[in-house]
């Protein structure tokens, strides 16, 4: 019986070991967050490094942010980068929360949905116009986005509001920073601005 040369056996063994190491490193990179865990700063980043789900959300946000950056290349002023730095600071402040993990997860999901909607990175439905208070010129234009959680962008004149779907006993209710949109059977109750009264709006 003839056996392969010793050098061939040695080379094959080294190659198999190298490929195995590459798989291990590749898997580790795929499972970890987008940032270097060796340089993790603070308890929140350390938690992300040790949590597969949070690491996956971090990688997803990095991908979504990169795609948004391409869309925002002509944005003036260039606010996206500044906003992202502020978001990271806010995420890291989740250590102050009663439930830091829940706070961190929520921050990721809302930020991902926000960027996907604002920069039109996911399928959308609309726009739809709603006339409010029986005044044809008082119109709210709404576009819905297939994000998680679902979002909409409402426009009224030169003002824009991003809103997230909220639990509701009937209809679809979305809430933004100071605005809300509650639709039921083609009619909507809209609040636009802090402390302002409800507007009754009909779909155009």
Protein language model features and the residues they cover:
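C-terminal segment of classical bacterial N-terminal signal peptides
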Residues: 17-27
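N-terminal alpha-helical modules
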Residues: 28-204
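Bacterial N-terminal signal peptides that target proteins for export
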Residues: 2-14, 21
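Compositionally biased, intrinsically disordered/low-complexity regions enriched for serine, proline
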Residues: 1-2, 30
């Amino acid at each position: 019986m003839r056996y392969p040369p010793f050098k061939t056996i040695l080379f094959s063994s080294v190659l198999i070991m190298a490929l195995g190491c590459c798989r291990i490193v590749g898997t580790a990179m795929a499972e970890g967050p987008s940032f270097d865990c060796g340089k993790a700063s603070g308890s929140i980043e350390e938690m992300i490094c040790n949590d597969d789900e949070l690491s996956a959300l971090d990688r997803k946000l990095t991908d979504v942010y990169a795609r948004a950056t391409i869309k925002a290349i002509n944005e003036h002023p260039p606010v996206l980068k500044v906003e992202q730095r502020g978001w990271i600071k806010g995420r890291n402040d989740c250590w102050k929360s009663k439930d830091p993990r829940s706070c961190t997860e929520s921050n990721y999901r809302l930020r991902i949905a926000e960027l996907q909607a604002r920069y039109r990175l996911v399928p959308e439905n609309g726009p739809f116009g709603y006339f409010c208070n029986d005044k044809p010129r008082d119109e709210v234009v709404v576009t819905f986005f297939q994000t998680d959680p679902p979002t909409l962008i409402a426009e009224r004149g030169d003002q824009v509001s991003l809103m997230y779907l909220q639990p509701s006993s009937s209809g679809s209710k979305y809430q933004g920073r100071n605005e809300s949109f509650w639709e039921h059977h083609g009619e909507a109750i809209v609040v636009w601005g802090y402390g302002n009264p409800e507007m009754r709006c009909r779909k155009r």
